[in-house]
Design a protein with these regions (language model features):
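Short beta-strand scaffold segments in enzyme catalytic cores
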Residues: 3-10, 32
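Conserved ATP-utilizing enzyme core subdomain
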Residues: 16-118, 197, 210-233, 240
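Glycine-rich phosphate-binding/hydrolytic loop that grips phosphoryl groups
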Residues: 115, 173-224
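Glycine-rich phosphate-binding loops at beta-strand->alpha-helix junctions
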Residues: 138-161
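Phosphate/ATP-binding catalytic cores across multiple sugar-kinase/actin-like superfamilies
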Residues: 106-138
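C-terminal helix-coil-helix/basic helical segment that borders enzyme active sites and/or dimer interfaces
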Residues: 126-136, 143, 166-175
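A short acidic Gly-Thr/Ser loop motif
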Residues: 1-4, 25-27, 144-152
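Short helix-capping/linker segments at secondary-structure and domain boundaries
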Residues: 37-44, 126-128, 192-203
Length: 247
């Protein structure tokens, strides 16, 4: 998972399209925006969650619950996706202004906004994932990637609220992928599959039920060289063959 998106892989399913994917909430957007606002642009994120950790004892739970209860997106059913058009810097600014007016410290503000993100993830799991699980309803493993992987306050809250789940960064998974490299690797894979004309299974909750080629290729000056590398045939495309693709 990223801090604003969840992808659920059933442990027992051998069907590629059995996975579930949706956006959980603001991710790092609010935290990063609040850091810029509170430091006059000198800091763009909470490095290692240091500032938020100092304010954890002063988290304003009422603000967390109020936001998560009254933002309609959190009650919206799947499939759903969102972005900065909803979870914007302006929303973060309104929370910062409200807390500053109440005399809250910078540390408390960052901790509270971090908790909004972390708790939005937990509630999304409880609402959309746990009901689909068989047996004891426990999520076995949660792997974090992206910027949130480097904010221990998020990870700590997830582990606290989901004590029977293993919460780790993505590099602890069998793939051992660097948490910050996953998206780049994914785009490279999608580009490879797009050039090969290989469709990708869509999530089980997606409005489209048909596998689709994910992405559009914009050829550059070395496009033919790229095709040769991808398909493994120096005569491609003159022979009108796809080449040797090993997956």
């Amino acid at each position: 998972m990223r801090t604003g998106n969840a992808t659920i892989l059933p442990a027992t399913s051998k069907t590629p399209s059995a996975y579930l994917a949706f956006d959980t909430g603001p991710g790092n957007v609010f935290i990063d925006a609040a850091m810029r606002i509170l430091t006059n642009g000198e800091q763009h994120y909470d490095h290692n969650g240091a500032l938020g950790a100092k304010g954890e004892a002063d988290i304003d739970g009422a603000i967390v619950d109020d936001y998560l209860t009254n933002e309609p997106y959190f009650q919206q059913k799947l499939p759903k996706t969102t972005g900065r058009e909803l979870f914007s810097d302006d929303v973060a600014r309104s929370i910062v202004t409200k807390m500053k007016s109440a005399g809250k410290s910078t540390e408390a503000i960052i901790a509270t906004i971090t908790r909004i993100t972390a708790e939005s993830i937990v509630r999304a799991y409880e609402q959309f994932v746990v009901p689909l699980l068989e047996g004891d309803g426990i999520i076995d493993e949660i792997y974090i990637c992206g910027g949130g992987a480097y904010n221990p306050n998020i990870k700590k809250h997830l582990q606290s609220r989901l004590p029977k789940s293993r919460v780790s960064n993505l590099d602890a998974a069998p793939s051992k992928l660097d948490p910050s490299a996953k998206e780049a690797i994914l785009f490279a894979l999608l580009g490879f599959l797009a050039i090969c004309g290989r469709p990708v299974p869509v999530a089980a909750d997606a409005e489209s039920k048909q596998p689709a080629i994910m992405g559009v290729v914009t050829p550059g000056q070395n496009y033919h060289d790229v095709l040769q590398i991808v398909v493994g045939d120096p005569d491609f495309p003159s022979k009108r063959v796809l080449g040797r693709v090993i997956m």
